[in-house]
Amino acid sequence: MKRIAVIPGDGIGKEVTEAAMHVTEVAAATFGIDVECEWFDYGADTYLKTGVGLPEGALESLRDDFDAIYLGALGDPRIADMAHGKEILLGLRFGLDLFVNYRPVKLLDERLCPLKDRTVEDLDFVVFRENTEGAYVGVGGIFKQGTADEVALQEDVNTRKGVERIIRYAFEYARIHGRKSVVMSDKSNVLRYGHDLWQRVFEEVRVEYEDIESWHLFVDALTMQIVKNPAQFDVIVTCNMFGDIVTDLCAELQGGLGVASSANLNPQTGAGLFE
């Protein structure tokens, strides 16, 4: 028996999640898998009533009692800063150490692609985004807020452990799934410290995978190449913020966020959050 925790989210998220669960039921029946789903009302309505996105003990229960988590879209105009969405999504990503953000880029129908004369074969690659570090860890602060001397600091945190495990996972995925190349993207020509670490770790890891072609692209060059010639890519790996931006570009080339899938994974523990 596989147990799935379902968090339908807000607005259209609830409708999409309900439809997705019908697909899950059919898939489970087709492949002979016993699935039990439990729904959790973590979203804007509950947050407005309680002031809490993830209640006490929820993280531990989701980690220990379920095989996977389905999460619908979060967002409500009544909560302008998306505080509940950040608490739920980032709480799960960081709390469950879901360091792999897996974003397959696959064009299902040529009519959905805004690029001229692209076929379904042209868009078929995978982006791996580091999911627990970088500029999204929330380290920073504001000094002298509201004055002419206001200063805002936002730290970009990169650890050798975090960088190595996502780069290594990208290479392992490429090897297992028959992908021929891995591209690492950063901005080390400007971000001389954090992304120098990315460069050095990439060079160290790539020599262990001589059967896989690998190269480096600065992120601005990567975005141009994705638009110009997406067929050249098999696997892309990058940091948290750049991955967030690049995968939205890739989603639009597929036809929009509505047809772009996303998984947040920890291959070491087996935890998985699917959006």
Regions found by a protein language model. Give the residues of each.
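Glycine-rich phosphate/diphosphate-binding loop of Rossmann-like nucleotide-binding domains
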Residues: 5-22, 26-28, 147-220, 232
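Glycine-rich phosphate/nucleotide-binding loop
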Residues: 46, 225-275
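Short acidic loop-to-helix transition motifs that present clustered carboxylates
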Residues: 110, 217-224
